[in-house]
Amino acid sequence: MAKKSSSQLIVLSLLAIVSLALYLGYNLPNRWQYALENRALSLIAIVITGAAIALATMIFQTVVNNRILTPSILGLDSLYLLIQTAIIFLFGSSTLLSMNSIALFVLCTGLMMAFSLVLYHFLFKKENQNIFFLLLVGIIFGTFFGSLTTFMEVLIDPNEFQIAQDIGFASFNRINTQILWVALAILVATIVFSLRYWHCFDVLALGRENAVNLGIDYQKTLKILLILVAILTSVSTALVGPLTFLGLLVMNVTVEFVRDYRHKVLIPAAMLISIITLVLRQLLVTHIFTFRTTLSIIVNFVGGVYFIYLLLRANKKWQ
């Protein structure tokens, strides 16, 4: 099992390197230095986003013990869209476009983190609070934020409506260098901090009762891991925009491909698959569709179809 898992990680690493090299070198124009620099920045953003979404989804699915749910159910994606739309609604699109990139990144990340912490604080005041109650509240807030966003989009100037709509699509083509390094630093710090809990993931995957019986301080560990999920989701969303179905797609492909219960194998594999997926789809957007579509549309279409497939497959098992 260990030898097979090592071989699979090596194969995924090689595929990731090949896909990164292909993205960097494919169809370079005459002014290749400028194009190479832009592509390198996009690749760094892809690596940050892919790793952050993979780790956040892996932690979240381990905690809730469900392979269909993703961190987007907490409503953070909807809150991100609400923040950006509210700025356009209150101050105009020119204010949003002229804002300091780092200030906007910190504002979005800070508000998403503040929302998560307040939510966790009130929901986990009581011991033994059911995690699924948190998911229910997250769905309610996500719907509420989405409704507010739609309400403001209806009222704003039609010329600014398109800008508000563009915010909802993830993009790796307008990455700010300063934000990139801030996001990278946060990602590295979060991954390093999470390493001390990787050994707990295998136990948490067995369920709450088994985890408690095996000596895990469940409530404390749950709070810390959910905070890590909020940090990773906030950073990736504030950096490039929402990618709703990426985590769902990557996690299920990882489990089907690796078939190993150990999270020290699953997490690196999920990160590599996430990066490969984003690179290949960015290649499609750039060179096949020539920017006539967006990365979000491709990810959400494929992820949505796969989500329906998972539901149908689960329904067959229950029949």
Predicted regions and their residues:
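Alpha-helical transmembrane segments in inner-membrane proteins
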Residues: 1-319
